[in-house]
Amino acid sequence: DSSYYNTGEIVLMKKLPYRIVRNGKGDTRSIVKKTNIMGFTCLEQDCIYTDFPESVQEGDIIEFGNVGGYSIVSKPPFIQPNCKILSITPEGDLVEIKRQETYEDIFQTFNFNL
């Protein structure tokens, strides 16, 4: 789950590099070809990739590259918690550099006892 705000404004300027992790449920009825990849917000500009050229199905994971640090501060702090952030070490290992947020993380700054 992601949105335009997780990838940043670069998605409006160029096609991001991507990798698909095939995890589909094997239901060929759910295969989608040549589609727009939309984010989870209700905003019409929340388009991560226009005319995605490959077939994907429910359960597949699309990993977008070339996404920088501004993407973690641009996302609105509602609708859905931020995803975790991974970094690739020089040795090629994945390291979690920021854990996934929870709804508790989002709401802990609010005072609901008014």
Where are these regions (language model features)?
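Charged (often Lys/Glu-rich) extended helix/loop segments that serve as interaction or gating elements
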Residues: 1-114
